[in-house]
Structure formats: C-alpha cells, structure tokens
Regions:
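Binding-site signature for planar aromatic cofactors or substrates
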Residues: 1-217
Length: 217
C-alpha cells in the first residue's frame, strides 16, 4: 500500500509584493508581453507551456499541456494535429481556455475565447522552422489513435525518412497546423500572503476595447 499523504502539509506561502491597478497596462496583450518576457528572461524552463482546455459539443471537457508559439493582438497560437482529440473537439465546439502558471514568479494567466485555425501560410512558416525530426514526427503520428506497440511508430518513422530522403524541404501535412485562441477574457493572477491574491480580469467589449476589473481571490 502506498504511504498516506497528508495534503494539508502540501502548502507554500506566497511572498510577492502584489499588483496594483496603476501598474497594469490598459491593453492585456501588452501586459501579457511584459509578463511573458519576464518569465523567459528569468530562465524558467518551458516558460511557454500552457494548459489548453477544450470540450466536446455536449460539454465533456478535456485538458492537456501545449506550447505557446506566438501571440499578438489577434490572439494566442499553438500548433497540433487537426485530427487529434483536441482538433475534433475544436471543430465541434470552437471555444477554449488557456492557463499559464509560472510558479517561481507566483504568477498565472488565464485566457478564454473562440478558436480559429491559422492561415496555411502561417502553419507552413512555423512547420518549416521546426527541426526535421519534428517535421517527420508530424507525418508519422496519427495523434490520439490507439496503436499496438511503439515499434509501429518506429517503423513509420523509418518509412517517412525514406520517403522524404531526397526532399530538402518537407511538405506541410494536410492534417497539421495552427490554432489561434482569440481572447474574450484575460486574467492576471499574482500570489499574495494569506491567500489574498491579486486578480485583474480584462473583458473585451463589443467595440473591441478592454474593460479591467479587480476580482476577489
């Protein structure tokens, strides 16, 4: 039997100075850019890792970690297999939520909104920036499908390596590309002492402008 774990002992205290409204940028994308830059330059591993939550048409949720591969005023971009579970869910229910947690900085960002595919040109540009092995992997894996053994992937990789051996530039697989989460709400969370954290939520208005509110922790 596994040793019993006392969950009440799994606790840490937050010690940051917190956030003030006057310090927050009126544009949440600019505020995110500041926080993301801090996370990257702090040397945090996988500073662009984020949890992506999707749901089926009937509302059954699922979540997984993906990598943020770009952001601008249009939204937040990640790439994947369109035929994967998340791809099928996004096709049926094109809304998603993202959560990024930088534990050493005691910061979290939550993003929610509708989802759209990136252009084929954007997908090609990113695909061709990837290492060749990763490009081959996109051709090899039928993501989320059941397979009998690892050797099936290894055999498929050998097959694709041979198939594309004479091609310096690999084609973009038709089933692979990017998604953009177009934000409707973005929340910035900063840990504080006594669990009285600072939370600021930006909500996009109909005219495209952002409204910012402080939320209770």
């Amino acid at each position: 039997m596994r040793d019993a774990i006392d969950f009440s002992t799994l606790r840490r205290e937050y010690e940051t100075a917190g956030l003030r409204r006057a310090e927050m940028h009126p544009d949440p994308i600019e505020q995110f850019a500041t926080w993301f830059s801090t996370a990257v330059h702090s040397g945090l591993p996988d500073a662009n890792a984020m949890t992506l939550a999707t749901a089926t048409k009937s509302g059954k949720p699922s979540a997984r970690v993906v990598l943020l591969k770009g952001f601008d005023q249009r939204g937040f971009v990640f790439f994947t297999n369109y035929d994967s579970d998340k791809g099928r869910e996004l096709k049926a229910n094109p809304f998603a939520a993202l959560a990024i947690y930088w534990m050493p900085l005691e910061r979290q960002v939550r993003i929610s909104g509708r989802v759209e595919k990136t252009s084929r040109a954007e997908s090609k540009e990113y695909f061709h920036s990837r290492p060749r092995g990763s490009q081959l992997g996109a051709w090899v894996s039928r993501q989320s499908e059941v397979i009998d053994a690892r050797r099936i992937l290894d055999a498929k990789l050998a097959e694709m390596t041979e198939r594309f051996a004479r091609q310096k530039v690999l084609e973009l697989p038709p089933h692979w590309g990017g998604y953009r989460v177009v934000p409707e709400a973005i929340e910035f969370w900063q840990g504080r002492a006594n669990r009285l954290h600072d939370r600021f939520r930006y909500t996009r208005q109909k005219d495209g402008r952002w409204n910012m509110d402080r939320l209770a922790p």
